[in-house]
């Protein structure tokens, strides 16, 4: 019996040992082993990458929220520019209005000069309004020819004068051309000094004298052509008949005998 009990106790101890030995590998694998630790470390890195993606999304949202603020600031700048232009335009209009109501120089002007001065100031006001509208809406028209010129030197004004002359003289056949020039010259000379006006007047006087000489010479030539030597109408008729003498010489001879 003692032997059987000892054998049974031995079997029980061996079973416990086997059970303990089986649990050890499981504990080693499930514990802090190298392979298990590496796998979890990789998963931790994946979680870090996910956090970075969230950061990118947050940055994009922040940028999207910042952009409207920039647009608002730009609109404010544009509005301020427009207000400044309006203030300048209002100031110009007040100055022009003041000049229209009260002339700066206390001088006596003829009704024509007063009208020309008012028209000139009105034109300046219209040009100022147009310029303000262009600047407000960002209009930039490309112009050529006379409108594109901005003369400053003598050569520039010479070229400008040629283009202007070609532009105006193309209407010289019009019935209203002379009266148009009269008004134009007076309007463009209204702001000149007396000495400059005298120079222009002298130049026009010389031109008028030359035109008169040419007209007299032309009339003298016409009178010479109208004089018929040797008998007036009789000689003229004789010459006309002589033109037919080549075909039949009897016409001229019969005419002389008859006379």
UniProtKB/Swiss-Prot annotation:
Keyword Coiled coil assigned: yes
Residue positions where Phosphotyrosine is found in the record: 255
Region (Disordered), start-end ranges: 1-111, 218-247
One Pfam family, short name: eIF3_subunit
Compartment(s) of residence: Cytoplasm
Covalent crosslink: Glycyl lysine isopeptide (Lys-Gly) (interchain with G-Cter in SUMO2): 107
InterPro entries registered for this protein in UniProt: eIF3-like_dom_sf, eIF3j
Acidic residues biased stretches: 41-60
Name assigned to this protein: Eukaryotic translation initiation factor 3 subunit J
Species, as recorded: Pongo abelii (Sumatran orangutan)
Taxonomic lineage from the root: Eukaryota, Metazoa, Chordata, Craniata, Vertebrata
